[in-house]
Regions:
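Ligand-recognition surfaces built from glycine- and aromatic
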Residues: 23-30, 120-122, 215-252
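Fungal secretory targeting signals
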Residues: 1-20
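N-terminal module-boundary/linker segments of secreted carbohydrate-active enzymes
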Residues: 18-61
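Secretory/extracellular carbohydrate-interaction modules
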Residues: 58-63, 67-164
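Short, surface-exposed beta-strand/loop "edge" segments at domain boundaries and coil↔beta transitions
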Residues: 82-93, 147-153, 172-177, 211, ...
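Short tryptophan-centered beta-strand motifs in secreted/extracellular beta-sheet-rich domains
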Residues: 125, 188-196, 201-203
Length: 252
């Protein structure tokens, strides 16, 4: 990845100031989706439908039943069905849950990418949750994913009570250590920053930063995921609205 690259950057303006979003466009007309592919809750078990970066981009890019523009304000809406045993939704290999989730790619090629945590690596999202699932910790809205281990190093959750937590796996085969990051009521905008920079993992909620232990992971190459990864026990559909999203890397 190029040094001092700023990827997928959109202005993080206050809610009342976000005037640039076009409600008539597909999400790709309002957000730089060149750095993302999209995993959907459709397809077959272990092989979900994936929309490539090139097909997401532009005002006439991909839109679908679970990934679309809010016609009132241009925000990106992502919905995900609940328990696949009830809803029949498709899951990725190694997962028991369904998702409408963005996965980081190389903007030059559209291929999957990862990065070293020794540099600067941040994911900043301004968003709100309209409906969280009824899983133990709620809907996963952001991940730092370890590439070689093919496991989430850190998953950030939003519960039906508005509690925001993060689960950090205690090594590639370890259980998650859960840390509470804050509380934001359903339907309320907030901004999170996931950072794995200078070999230090941290998450900020509305400016309140929590530094996290990475246990026995070492410093694996990782990539970001963001969106709506439903962890529910029932058929409850989760709904996430994204107002802005930015990925920044500096590998110098």
């Amino acid at each position: 990845m190029a040094p001092k690259s700023i990827i997928g950057l959109l202005s993080l303006l206050p809610v009342t100031a976000v005037l640039a979003l076009d409600p008539s466009c597909a999400p790709g007309g309002n957000f730089d989706l060149s750095v993302w592919s999209l995993q959907l809750p459709t397809g077959s078990a272990g092989k979900v439908d994936t929309i490539k970066s090139r097909d997401l981009q532009g005002c006439n890019g991909y839109t679908g039943p679970t990934f679309f523009t809010d016609k009132s304000n241009g925000e990106l809406i992502l919905t995900a069905p609940g328990n696949p045993d009830i809803t029949g939704c498709a899951t990725t290999s190694g997962s028991e849950h369904c998702r409408t989730e963005l996965r980081e790619v190389d903007p030059a090629t559209g291929q999957n990418t990862d990065w070293a945590p020794a540099g600067t690596n941040t994911l900043t999202v301004a968003m709100k949750v309209i409906q969280a699932d009824d899983g133990s910790h709620g809907t996963a809205i952001g991940q730092v994913f370890a590439a070689a281990a093919s496991k989430p190093l850190a998953e950030m959750y939003y519960s039906q009570k508005g509690d925001i937590t993060v689960g950090v796996k205690q090594g590639p085969s370890g259980n998650q250590a859960i840390t509470k990051l804050g509380t934001v009521p359903l339907g309320t905008y907030f901004t999170y920053i996931m950072s794995y920079s200078d070999d230090v993992l941290s998450i900020s909620i509305n400016g309140n930063k929590t530094t996290l232990d990475t246990f026995s992971w070492g410093t694996p190459n990782c990539y970001f995921k963001s969106g709506n990864y439903n962890q529910g026990k029932t058929a409850v559909t989760s709904e996430v609205h994204i107002q802005s999203i930015a990925v920044v890397h500096d590998q110098e």
